[in-house]
Amino acid sequence: MAGHSKWANIQHRKGRQDEKRGRIWTRIMREITVAARAGGGDLSANPRLRLALDKARAANMPAERIKYNIDKATGNAEGQSYEEIRYEGYGIGGAAIIVDTMTDNRLRTVAEVRHAFSKHGANMGTEGSVVFQFKHCGQLVYAPGSSEDQVMEVALQAGAEDVIMGEDGAIEVLTLPADFEAVKNALQAAGLRPELAEVTMRAENTIELQGEDAARMQKLLDALEDLDDTQAVYHNATL
């Protein structure tokens, strides 16, 4: 199927991650802690922890740091307790935004998220105000030039829901969250390594922003991403 390309947004996001690796590691360590406490340290029985470790390895986090966080989360040692909170809001041009956070102080976090929205001419919404515009799914994105036929054949045989060709040649594979690992592993076994692989909130429809509106939206997204308690930011804007 044809679809809008996410390539420019992915490249921008990867560039920011490279610039702020320390912050990315902090977010991943929080995810490891929450996943290990909720489901234990046995990787075979804890898919959320497996996904967190995949993120850690992709971010080049040292193995000893990963092990330390799992041991700390599953042992008797006292550590920080994190609460997962989702915020929703409206960006430039009415674009829908979801901000997923992990925090040890919800009052601090909601104040920081609200301030970021208002500072950039946007508004926080109520729970459920925009989340219906997104689909919880697995997503793998392959660079332009990848073989669409090969990706499609392997992905669909492994249980993918859809394979979408972007306007610039990038290929997007979508899965149910429960099927994400199996599809990713099948594609990797076939020698197909994605530029992006994650369980995400994918916008069902997009809003195109241009010029000054696009620049303002990007500043808002960057501000939300830069908050210490932010784990992920999802939106439906094409910039």
From Swiss-Prot:
Positions of disulphide bridges: none
DNA-binding recorded as keyword: yes
Gene Ontology MF term list: DNA binding
Keywords tagged on the record: Cytoplasm, DNA-binding, Transcription, Transcription regulation
Subcellular location(s) per record: Cytoplasm
InterPro entries: Integrase-like_N, TACO1_YebC-like_2nd/3rd_dom, TACO1_YebC_N, Transcrip_reg_TACO1-like, Transcrip_reg_TACO1-like_dom3, YebC-like
Residues forming coiled coils: none
Main location class: cytoplasm
UniProt record, GO biological process: regulation of DNA-templated transcription
Location of region: Disordered: 1-22
Domain of life: Bacteria
A single cellular component GO annotation: cytosol
Pfam families xrefs: TACO1_YebC_N, Transcrip_reg
Family: Belongs to the TACO1 family.
PANTHER family: TRANSCRIPTIONAL REGULATORY PROTEIN YEBC-RELATED (PTHR12532:SF6), TRANSLATIONAL ACTIVATOR OF CYTOCHROME C OXIDASE 1 (PTHR12532)
Protein name per Swiss-Prot or TrEMBL: Probable transcriptional regulatory protein Veis_4238
